[in-house]
From Swiss-Prot, chain B:
The gene is MED27. The keyword Lipid metabolism does not apply. This is Mediator of RNA polymerase II transcription subunit 27. It comes from Bos taurus (Bovine). The modification Phosphoserine is found at residue 132. It is found in: Nucleus.
Length: 300, 311
């Protein structure tokens, strides 16, 4: 990254997993490198100039995964738990947490992961005929000082939380999708070296599903401990135990990073969104077919 | 039968001897009585002196006679206890009521037992002196003179030799990297990184391993001022358990004559943790027990077991 600044960030560290700053980069370098047209460069000078008064510091730390990322976390598996037959989302969550407490897990506060979708504005699409890419900007309460920006199948950017402000500045190039905010909230449970987070996924006002995240802190290589993780998942998810997440297969024995967890959450949210779309489409079909039935009752 | 007879004879002699002792005592006390009374009841001083000396002589003669009599009798009595290996306590065997007071048989057993104990203790101390298991020089206080002799072989090795041994071990195991540093004088500290599984801090004194701490691969092993943190333990229960087992291994692998072999055995054992999260327990076949993977590695076979599954 060309614009690597020499100064280290002076941001204080967060509670757990505070992401350390190995080196400091200008956030826009990421954007420029990920295929922005040359016209962006004009904006570049505006953003970094001291005239932008909304930041306490003009420095902006940013790292591109995986090459320059120094931090690690325990191997984590994020999965969806289907809602039990004849039960509400809330009841299924309670069932699951009771099972965890029976196992001996201890409650340890709450967590929240949220995700907002952006799509590239039509005006910025170059003449090369690039398709509009979706970008997801996510936050995780486990890393309160960081913000994650992901492309589907693309690179993952880990930045300071004031990246959100930058996104406002960039609204000519990335536009927020309407009512796209999706988040999961719930309780953290600690069992031995395992950290289990059971959350309710909500889109707008209504609950759409259940997310289960299991982190095994001591191990940092996904392929090493998948069997062990699977045994633990089976102990409380039973028949709903998921298969190995796709991110496990991608990088053979690389060190697992927080960004991998965010990718899993992004995939989970997309899956739930698609399920909702299918549900709505189904309902629409039902409505139209019932209408046509009604019509058929009338003689033409 | 002859025994009983001789005892009977002796008993008679005893009775005579006792009365002879009584006679001796009374004659001796008469001597002192006479001395106490002094000279009296005679008109002339000469008469008094003569009577006193005669009386005193008589008394001494009777003492002499009684003493001779006692000596004669004591020869008759003899020394019956001398024949017995237990000396006087052997006389307990003469007690006719064996059933009520089985003192003698108990005494014999205790005697045998203590004899054996002494014999075995002697053998053990001989063997232990050949193979000194003492890890530190301070404890060799038994013979302070020998201490300087024992030190050169085990505790005072040139740092260059320690470096050589460690670098040889480092080359032996490709998945293990060993970083050696000497922050405080000549004692080496090793930071062993095993694959992407764990890190071990090993504190050495010469080629003796004094302390080990096992931590996770993603845990910080340095203090704020950049030194190796040899005091704080791992945040994860699994590595706290492995630390305990590693300390057990330190005490298990002991060969004071060849300290380099000890370090090599320990490292070989440690290397088996490369599969800490991948190897199921050899006994129950499961990965988890109370939320922990199989943390124990057998010292000989290096097989994985849960702490509670090993013998």
């Amino acid at each position: 990254m060309g614009g690597g600044a020499e100064s280290d960030s002076d941001v204080t560290e967060g509670p757990r997993h505070a992401l350390p700053r190995g080196r400091v980069d200008w956030a826009l370098c990421f954007y420029v490198s990920s295929g922005a047209p040359a016209s962006i460069r004009a904006l570049f000078s505006e953003v970094v100039s001291p005239r932008v008064g909304c930041w306490s510091t003009p420095h902006f730390s940013c790292l591109i995964l995986p090459s320059s990322w120094p931090d690690t976390m325990g191997v984590t598996c994020v999965s969806q738990m289907p809602v039990a037959e004849g039960k509400s989302v809330q009841q299924t969550v309670e069932l699951l947490t009771r099972k965890l407490e029976m196992l001996g897990a201890e409650k340890q506060g709450t967590f929240c992961v949220d995700c907002e979708t952006y799509h590239t504005a039509a005006s910025t699409l170059g003449s090369q005929g690039q398709a509009g890419k979706l970008m997801y900007v996510m936050h995780n309460s486990e890393y309160p000082l960081s913000c994650f920006a992901l492309f589907e199948n693309g690179p993952c950017l880990v930045a300071d939380t004031n990246f959100d402000v930058l996104m406002v500045k960039l609204k000519g190039f990335f536009q927020s999708a309407k009512a796209s905010k999706i988040e999961t909230r719930g309780t953290r449970y600690q069992y031995c070296d395992f950290l289990v987070k059971v959350g309710t996924v909500t889109m707008g006002p209504s609950a759409r599903g259940i997310s289960v995240e299991v982190e095994y802190g001591p191990c940092v290589v996904a392929s090493d401990c998948w069997s062990l993780l699977l045994e633990f998942l089976q102990s409380f998810l039973g028949s709903h135990t998921p298969g190995a997440p796709a991110v496990f297969g991608n990088r053979h024995d690389a060190v697992y990073s927080p960004a991998d967890t965010m990718v899993q959450y992004m995939e989970l949210f997309n899956k739930i969104r698609k399920q909702q779309q299918i549900l709505w489409m189904g309902r629409d079909l039902e409505r139209t077919s019932s209408l046509s039935c009604n019509f058929s009752q009338y003689p033409t | 039968m002859a025994d009983v007879l001789s005892v009977g004879v002796n008993l008679e002699a005893f009775a005579q001897a006792i009365s002879a002792i009584q006679a001796l005592r009374s004659s001796v006390s008469r001597v002192f009585d006479c001395l106490k009374d002094g000279m009296r009841n005679k008109e002339t001083l000469e008469g008094r002196e003569k009577a006193f000396i005669a009386h005193f002589q008589d008394n001494l003669h009777s003492v002499n006679r009684d003493l001779n009599e006692l000596e004669r009798l004591s020869n008759l009595v003899g020394k019956p206890s001398e024949n017995h290996p237990l000396h006087n306590s052997g006389l307990l065997s003469l007690d006719p009521v064996q059933d009520k007071t089985p003192l003698y048989s108990q005494l014999l057993q205790a005697y045998k037992w203590s004899n054996k104990l002494q014999y075995h203790a002697g053998l053990a101390s001989g063997l232990l002196n050949q193979q000194s298991l003492k890890r530190s020089a301070n404890q060799m206080g038994v013979s302070a003179k020998r201490r300087p002799k024992a030190q050169p072989t085990t505790l005072v090795l040139p740092p260059q030799y320690v470096d050589d041994v460690i670098s040889r071990i480092d080359r032996m195991f490709p998945e293990m990297t060993i970083h050696l540093s000497r922050p405080n004088g000549t004692s080496a500290m090793l930071l062993v990184t095993l694959g992407k599984v764990l890190k071990v801090i090993v504190v050495m004194r010469s080629l003796f391993i004094d302390r080990t701490i096992v931590k996770g691969y993603n845990e910080n092993v340095y203090t704020e001022d950049g030194k190796l943190d040899i005091w704080s333990k791992s945040n994860y229960q699994v590595f706290q358990k492995v630390t305990d087992h590693a300390t057990t291994a330190l005490l298990h692998y002991q060969l004071p004559q060849m300290p380099d072999v000890v370090v090599r055995s320990f490292m070989t054992w440690l290397r088996s943790y490369i599969k800490l999260f991948q190897a199921p327990c050899q006994r129950c076949g499961k990965f988890l027990q109370d939320g922990l993977p199989p943390t124990w590695r057998d010292f000989r076979t290096l097989e994985a077991f849960h702490d509670t599954c090993r013998q």
